[in-house]
């Protein structure tokens, strides 16, 4: 008898660091919602042409790619996936700044303010 595995959902190449996963999990726990996932999307905008959009989402879209990090689902839509392949999302908490940061090896340049990339 042959057992075939069901095809798994397609995963993306974005990495959520331990610090970012812990912060996202903390925010989700504060909201009391276990149905939300962290979504990263790339949209037109900013002076360099493209900008990131990072938000919690309760929707699953056709073609979404999903991976889980520390109990947090990270979703990338199929149109954004090529732009963020190999990117790393971190959470920084220092005197100078606090927030999520994205290190993307595909970005060839960014604007002076750092809000957008190309």
From Swiss-Prot:
Belongs to the HesB/IscA family. The modification N-acetylthreonine is found at residue 2. This is Protein Rv2204c. PROSITE patterns: HESB. One of its GO terms (cellular component) is plasma membrane. InterPro entries: FeS_biogenesis (IPR000361), FeS_cluster_insertion (IPR016092), FeS_cluster_insertion_CS (IPR017870), HesB-like_dom_sf (IPR035903). GO terms for molecular function: 2 iron, 2 sulfur cluster binding; 4 iron, 4 sulfur cluster binding; iron ion binding. One of its GO terms (biological process) is iron-sulfur cluster assembly. Keywords: Acetylation.
């Amino acid at each position: 008898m042959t057992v075939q595995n069901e095809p798994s959902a397609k995963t993306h190449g974005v990495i959520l660091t331990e610090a970012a996963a812990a912060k996202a999990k903390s925010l989700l726990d504060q909201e009391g919602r276990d149905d939300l996932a962290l979504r990263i999307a790339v949209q037109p905008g900013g002076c360099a042409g493209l900008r990131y959009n990072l938000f919690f989402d309760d929707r699953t879209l056709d073609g979404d790619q999903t991976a889980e990090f520390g109990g947090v689902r990270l979703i990338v839509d199929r149109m954004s996936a090529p732009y963020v392949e190999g990117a790393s999302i971190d959470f920084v908490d220092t005197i100078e700044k606090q927030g999520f940061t994205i290190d993307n090896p595909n970005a060839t340049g960014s604007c002076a303010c750092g809000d957008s990339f190309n």
